[in-house]
Amino acid sequence: PPFSINMFFLIIIGIVLIGVIVYWIFQSPFQYPYKKIFFDISGKRKPNENDLLDHYLIQHGIQEFVDHASYVELWKKECEQKIQKSKLKNLRSKQYLECIDDEGMFLFILERKQTRYRQVNYVKHHYHVKIPVRTLATDLCHIQIRYDALKKIGFECTLSEYYAKDQRKRMTKELREKIAKRDNYTCQICGKYMPDGIGLHIDHIVPIAKGGKTVESNLQVLCSKCNGRKSNK
């Protein structure tokens, strides 16, 4: 009968509405206010995340990060006040604590541009879209440490660039000769003997770019060919 069908639909609608209301009541009203910063790494094969951050701090300073951290503290106080007034205090308190992520307050999103095409009136047109490839999360403490270190060197370059310059300065003529004698003027890969020093290179076993230091234990003799092959890897 029509009455029974109408009742059936009313019951279904009622159940759906109750479900929506229950979901609305019990879902978390808290969303952590992350600060997102986007880096375009198109054309960069293996960008160093800390270098990206250093460049950003050199150009923009640290104030926006400090301001956002202050904003997060204000947001927390407002959330705590709402929890105290809520009839679901225990649930809201749990939801609030679960969303707190101060250690990942700042999100650095690395993007690459991709070329795509669409056809309009049989003519192909290209356009670019930015595709996120990686997201890095950090806190104000990490950013402050890097900012302070950059400040000490006058913001003249990234910390890795400064470190590399410092390590290269440590490669003195005396140290070169000491390593050459230690390795008997012999390439440590192919065994070529170079007593006259022609084609002899002093190589960092762990490259400076990867944190290697200019110390005896990290240096070796290589011939020009082997050194070139190693650099190309």
Q: Where would I find each of the regions flagged by the language model?
A:
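N-terminal signal-anchor transmembrane alpha helix of single-pass membrane proteins
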Residues: 1-37
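N-terminal topogenic membrane-targeting module
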Residues: 25-140
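Helix N-cap and loop-to-helix transition residues
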Residues: 139-142, 172, 207, 215, ...
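Short, charged surface segments at domain edges that flank catalytic/cofactor-binding sites
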Residues: 141-189
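Catalytic core segments in nucleotide and nucleic-acid processing enzymes
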Residues: 184, 228, 232
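Cys/His-coordinated zinc-binding microdomains
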Residues: 191, 224-227
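Histidine-centered nuclease catalytic patch
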Residues: 192-221, 232-233
